[in-house]
Structure formats: structure tokens, C-alpha cells
């Protein structure tokens, strides 16, 4: 009888759900990895655009069950246009999310995303930041952390956006701004002298992103060629030439 009571008590303890919130300074990764304890991670989304990175993978159906009508986007490419560096995102809602990967999330309403560790496909606390460069000398890193980050000069999406319609607006952080766990931000690691702003672009497809970046690179590489006296020459001419202010030997 005493053994049955002990087993029953243990089962109740295992079935009891422990809630943790992504608004705390640091995620309890050790607790979330326990197989004998059901843990529910709660992450608040404002209406509009948010960012998200989780330590486990979820299918599209699991994401749909965790929060209503979310749109998930991933960073697919970057390209400078004029003085603005465009960050191209594509819809990947149908793919769900991968552990440690940063995403852009659109939520039509303010709501909580609630996920239990027992429902996740796998647990992986390795952060997989996305780093991209363009042909103008810009390099961007899109990443997250499992604890709060205070960093001057990091770019992020403000918690509340006083904009209609709601847009994915980026702001450069000051010393008093904090990125809480599971939020993602952009680091402008290398900045071209002519680039002054960052802008998020919601592309219709990966094919569109490829077409934009390829066309821009072709335009740059097919520019006019000059000899050392400043005279325009054929791009197939042999010898030392100048293209876009750089010496080229052919």
C-alpha cells in the first residue's frame, strides 16, 4: 500500500506542469531538458512583428497549436540599394522552426506562445546565428541568446510599434535597451561607407531574393572599364584596368 502511494505521488509530480517565462533574465535550460518534468515555455507576442528563437524544433502544426495564425519568416539575403541595406525575409511558416535558428514572427493579435518540452521534436541549445554579406562590403549577423543582452548599436524590432499598418521596423539600441531571452537582433558587423540604414523587406519567394541579389551583382560586375589615363575601354581588353575605383588585371 505504501509503495502504491509513493508511485502515485511520483506520477502526479511528473504530470504537474511547471511554467517558465521568456521575460525572465535567463532561461532555465537545465530544467527544460529534464525528461521527468513537464515544462511549459511561455513567450509573449505583441500584435505585429516579433522575433523568436527557441531551444527546440517544432513542426508547422505544433506552432499553429502553440499560438494562433502566426506567420514565420527567415532571413534569406541582404543587398544594399542606395544608402539602405535591405534585409530580405521569406515566408517559411509551412516548415515550422528549427532549434537555435532566429526567425521573424508576425502575430495578428497580442498573445502568448505556449510550448511544452514534451511536445518538442528535439532539444538543442546551440545558437545558430545567420550571417550574411553583400557585394558592397556589408555583413549582418541575425542571432539570439538564452539570456538577456544589453548592447549598444544592436538593431532590433521595438516591443510596441505605433505604426498603421504594422511593419517590421528596426531601431538601433542604446545602453538602456535590453534583448530578453528568445528575442533576436541584428549586428551590423561590417558597414559599407555608403550604407546608413537597415530595412526589412518581405519578399514573396526565395526566387525573388535570388533574382534581386543576382541582378545587383551582375550590374556591379558589368560596369564600365577605364585605362590608367581615364579612357573608357572594352571590358575584354587585356592589361591593367580600373573598374568601380578598383584596379583589375586581365
Model region roles, listed by residue range:
Residues 1-8:
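Bacterial N-terminal signal peptides
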Residues 9-13:
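Sec/Tat signal peptide C-region and signal peptidase I cleavage site
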Residues 14-66, 90-210:
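A short, polar beta-strand/turn micro-motif
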Residues 62-85:
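A glycine-rich, hydrophobic loop/mini-helix early in the fold
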Residues 72, 170, 223-225:
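Hydrophobic beta-strand positions in blades of beta-propellers and related beta-sheet-rich domains
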Residues 76-79, 207-250:
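C-terminal outer-membrane/trafficking sorting elements
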Amino acid at each position: 500500500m505504501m509503495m502504491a502511494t509513493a508511485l502515485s505521488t511520483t506520477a502526479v509530480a511528473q504530470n504537474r506542469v511547471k511554467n517558465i517565462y521568456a521575460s525572465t533574465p535567463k532561461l532555465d535550460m537545465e530544467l527544460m531538458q529534464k525528461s521527468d518534468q513537464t515544462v511549459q515555455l511561455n513567450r509573449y507576442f505583441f500584435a505585429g512583428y516579433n522575433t523568436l528563437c527557441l531551444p527546440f524544433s517544432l513542426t508547422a502544426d505544433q506552432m499553429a497549436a502553440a499560438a494562433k495564425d502566426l506567420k514565420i519568416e527567415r532571413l534569406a539575403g541582404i543587398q544594399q540599394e542606395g544608402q539602405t541595406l535591405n534585409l530580405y525575409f521569406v515566408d517559411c511558416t509551412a516548415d515550422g522552426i528549427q532549434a537555435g535558428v532566429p526567425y521573424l514572427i508576425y502575430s495578428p493579435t497580442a498573445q502568448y506562445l505556449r510550448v511544452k518540452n514534451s511536445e518538442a521534436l528535439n532539444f538543442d541549445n546551440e545558437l545558430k546565428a545567420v550571417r550574411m554579406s553583400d557585394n558592397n562590403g556589408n555583413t549582418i549577423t541575425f542571432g539570439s541568446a538564452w539570456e538577456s543582452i544589453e548592447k549598444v548599436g544592436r538593431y532590433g524590432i521595438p516591443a510596441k510599434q505605433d505604426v498603421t499598418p504594422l511593419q517590421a521596423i528596426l531601431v538601433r539600441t542604446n545602453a538602456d535597451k535590453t534583448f530578453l531571452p528568445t528575442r533576436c537582433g541584428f549586428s551590423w558587423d561590417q558597414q559599407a561607407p555608403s550604407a546608413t540604414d537597415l530595412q526589412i523587406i518581405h519578399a514573396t519567394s526565395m526566387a525573388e531574393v535570388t533574382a534581386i541579389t543576382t541582378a545587383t551583382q551582375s550590374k556591379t560586375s558589368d560596369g564600365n572599364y577605364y585605362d590608367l589615363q581615364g579612357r573608357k575601354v572594352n571590358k575584354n581588353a587585356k592589361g591593367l584596368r580600373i573598374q568601380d575605383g578598383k584596379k583589375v588585371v586581365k
